[in-house]
């Protein structure tokens, strides 16, 4: 991008450059930075609303703290584009979230300024506390700062960390980036003054001295505490953070550098755990994003002068939409159904369900552990819970899945969105492990629909069971196989032969069925749509194995412990020896990029499957014909 419109930003190649700027120029820098973020994201796609809301806070943090010596830990991390731009990665922004380019989240391997990798929520306070106490152990006076959003504060892990931090006496600053409220201008001026006063050395010393003097006069001390709280209560709600041992400061306007910088400077000189409450607005500075921050949360490419527009040709139906429609249809049919999501209403396709069945919709916040056990409790009382959750986020509730659901054999349906590779969000959001970690749990079953129609059908099958079942499906559009309007399921635990060929049989789990069919056409191979990773259709498997010289399993999940491993176990248990090639995701974390390109790099497109099969089984009888196919 041309830097002609960003003369001040062009001079900032790292935070040291920023700290050399006159304070009077920082507002101009913030203005240019916001415009640069908007231009950049409009060309690449990515997270927008959250990044527009953290511009001034990012500028203030790098202006006040000695980064990277002082540690900044950004919770979730999708709001770190301004941070990346100010820390030497401005010129790489055109590569954002592309194969080989910048990550959309902080990555330690990408920059020394990314002190901790984040993407899942509510981890920042724990990480920053660990850094702060490690520094204290070494006698290092560095500051450690956790920046966490109000949504992430709903997770239990954040409060576990606060509880630990309050008694650890570490030089930790927790900044609550609250973008779910606003401060009116009249309150803002008074609030700015009180925030600076309460964050100052004088206030801290006076408060401690007063407590010392009054320690033998409990009634007076209690009165002083009440007066202190009432003084703060003029402009802030009652807060529990001081109960955790933090010095609470705020709320202050997170877009006002004249308030942010002096407050942070005062806090920098304080010892012990500090809690700063800043109020920001998602989409700040771009009217369209301010008006609809959800729509502009993670847009694709767009013209910022026009905003988001609907495509002229309707896109293919996504698996998420298939789930959302099924949920509404099944709710119409069965009044016992309830839908549960851990703060992913839009992402999981539950908007219509929420609108139509508000009394049966439960958004429990970013609290995956609670969501799973909450569903278990409902199932105990005869309710039929459906938990809509991203595959990667179910990892956070693994103990609850085993202990609270499976151990009690409760009929909970888990709709696992974003199974497999997710493209631009990268390794942190990939659903690579669900087959492996679900199929090893007693009582649990795992369905792997191949297309939109099967997704709806297998959701129905899962719902009809009297034990827990997970249904995994990928992000994005399907293959164009329209779902049937009825609510008929498919046979539980049964697959089907989709193509009959010679010598080699490809056992496909999930949406890789379709590239497998393409590869089989060239190889004249049999293709089996397995549908279920657990229970495995052992009868069909052994029949196919007996009729073929070699077997190939394909899955968009980890090879280790995955569906291919289940096939190998079944063959071994039956005492049947057949050459077996397992194709899937290798034992590495796969980074961000275009999903089709990522699959091709792992050999999971049709050409890659054909190549791997030919290379592996070239020594079998008829290999010449196979190699020439």
From Swiss-Prot:
Annotated InterPro entries = Dxylulose-5-P_synthase, THDP-binding, Transketo_C/PFOR_II, Transketolase-like_Pyr-bd, Transketolase_BS, Transketolase_C, Transketolase_CS
Describe the function of this protein.
Catalyzes the acyloin condensation reaction between C atoms 2 and 3 of pyruvate and glyceraldehyde 3-phosphate to yield 1-deoxy-D-xylulose-5-phosphate (DXP).
Q: What is its EC number?
A: 2.2.1.7
Q: Which organism is it from?
A: Acidovorax sp. (strain JS42)
Q: What pathway is this protein said to act in by its record?
A: Metabolic intermediate biosynthesis; 1-deoxy-D-xylulose 5-phosphate biosynthesis; 1-deoxy-D-xylulose 5-phosphate from D-glyceraldehyde 3-phosphate and pyruvate: step 1/1
Please state which protein family the record places this protein in: Belongs to the transketolase family. DXPS subfamily.
Q: Which reaction does it catalyse?
A: D-glyceraldehyde 3-phosphate + pyruvate + H(+) = 1-deoxy-D-xylulose 5-phosphate + CO2
Q: What residues does Mg(2+) bind to?
A: 150, 179
Q: Which SUPFAM superfamilies match?
A: Thiamin diphosphate-binding fold (THDP-binding), TK C-terminal domain-like
Please list the GO terms describing molecular function: 1-deoxy-D-xylulose-5-phosphate synthase activity; magnesium ion binding; thiamine pyrophosphate binding
- Name this polypeptide is given: 1-deoxy-D-xylulose-5-phosphate synthase
- Subunit comment: Homodimer.
User: Taxonomically, which superkingdom?
Assistant: Bacteria
What EC class is this? transferase
So which cofactors does this thing need? Mg(2+); thiamine diphosphate
For this UniProt record, the keywords arranged alphabetically read as follows: Isoprene biosynthesis, Magnesium, Metal-binding, Thiamine biosynthesis, Thiamine pyrophosphate, Transferase
Q: Does the keyword Magnesium apply?
A: yes
Keyword hit for Magnesium = yes
Q: Which GO terms describe its cellular component?
A: cytosol
Q: What does the note accompanying the cofactor annotation read?
A: Binds 1 Mg(2+) ion per subunit. Binds 1 thiamine pyrophosphate per subunit.
């Amino acid at each position: 991008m041309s830097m002609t419109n960003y003369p001040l930003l062009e001079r900032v190649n790292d935070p040291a450059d920023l700290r050399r700027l006159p304070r009077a120029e920082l507002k101009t820098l913030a203005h240019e930075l916001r415009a640069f973020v908007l231009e950049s994201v409009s060309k690449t796609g990515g997270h927008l609303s959250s990044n527009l809301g953290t511009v001034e806070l990012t500028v203030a943090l790098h202006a006040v703290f000695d980064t990277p010596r002082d540690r900044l830990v950004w919770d979730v991390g999708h709001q770190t584009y301004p941070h990346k731009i100010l820390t030497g990665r401005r010129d790489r922004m055109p590569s954002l979230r592309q194969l080989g380019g910048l990550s959309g989240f902080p990555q330690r391997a990408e920059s020394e300024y990314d002190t901790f990798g984040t993407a899942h929520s509510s981890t920042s306070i724990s990480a920053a506390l660990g850094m702060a106490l490690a520094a204290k152990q070494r006698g290092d006076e560095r500051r450690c700062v956790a920046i966490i959003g109000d949504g992430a504060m709903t997770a239990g892990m954040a409060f576990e960390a606060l509880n630990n931090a309050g008694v650890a006496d570490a030089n930790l600053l927790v900044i609550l980036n609250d973008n779910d409220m606003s401060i009116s201008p009249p309150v803002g001026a008074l609030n700015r003054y009180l925030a600076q006063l309460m964050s100052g050395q004088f206030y801290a010393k006076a408060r401690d001295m007063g407590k010392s003097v009054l320690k033998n006069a409990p009634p007076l001390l209690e009165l002083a505490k009440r007066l202190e709280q009432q003084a703060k209560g003029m402009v802030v709600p009652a807060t529990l953070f001081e109960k955790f041992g933090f010095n609470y400061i705020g709320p202050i306007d997170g877009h006002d550098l004249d308030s942010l910088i002096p407050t942070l400077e005062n806090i920098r000189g304080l010892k012990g755990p500090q809690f700063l409450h800043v109020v920001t607005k998602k989409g700040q500075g771009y009217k369209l994003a301010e008006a609809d921050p959800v729509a502009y949360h993670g847009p694709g490419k767009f013209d910022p002068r026009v905003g988001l527009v609907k495509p002229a040709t309707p896109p293919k139906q996504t698996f998420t939409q298939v789930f959302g429609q099924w949920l509404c249809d099944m709710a119409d049919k069965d009044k016992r159904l309830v839908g549960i999501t851990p703060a992913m209403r839009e992402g999981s396709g539950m908007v219509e369900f929420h609108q139509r069945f508000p009394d049966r919709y439960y958004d429990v916040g970013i609290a995956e552990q609670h969501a799973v056990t909450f569903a278990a409790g409902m199932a105990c009382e005869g309710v039929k819970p459906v938990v809509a959750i991203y595959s990667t986020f179910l990892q956070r509730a693994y103990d609850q899945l085993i202990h609270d659901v499976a151990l009690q054999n409760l009929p909970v349906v888990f709709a696992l969105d974003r199974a497999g590779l997710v493209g631009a969000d990268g390794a942190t959001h990939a659903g690579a492990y669900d087959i492996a970690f679900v199929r090893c749990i007693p009582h649990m079953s795992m369905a792997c629909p191949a297309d939109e129609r099967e997704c709806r059908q297998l959701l129905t099958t899962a719902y009809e069971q009297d034990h827990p079942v997970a249904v995994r499906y990928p992000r994005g559009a399907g293959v164009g196989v329209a779902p049937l309007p009825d609510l008929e399921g498919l046979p539980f635990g049964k697959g089907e032969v989709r193509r009959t060929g010679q010598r080699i049989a490809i056992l496909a789990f999930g949406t890789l069925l379709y590239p497998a069919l393409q590869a089989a056409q060239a190889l004249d191979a049999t293709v089996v749509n397995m549908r279920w990773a657990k229970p495995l259709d052992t009868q069909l498997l052994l029949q196919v194995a007996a009729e073929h010289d070699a077997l190939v399993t394909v899955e968009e999940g980890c090879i280790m412990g995955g569906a291919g491993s289940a096939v190998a176990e079944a063959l071994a248990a039956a005492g049947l020896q057949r050459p077996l090639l397992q194709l899937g995701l290798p034992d590495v974390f796969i980074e961000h990029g275009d999903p089709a390109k990522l699959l091709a790099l792992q050999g999971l497109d049709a050409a890659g499957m054909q190549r791997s099969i030919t290379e592996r089984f070239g020594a079998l009888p008829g290999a010449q014909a196979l190699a020439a196919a």
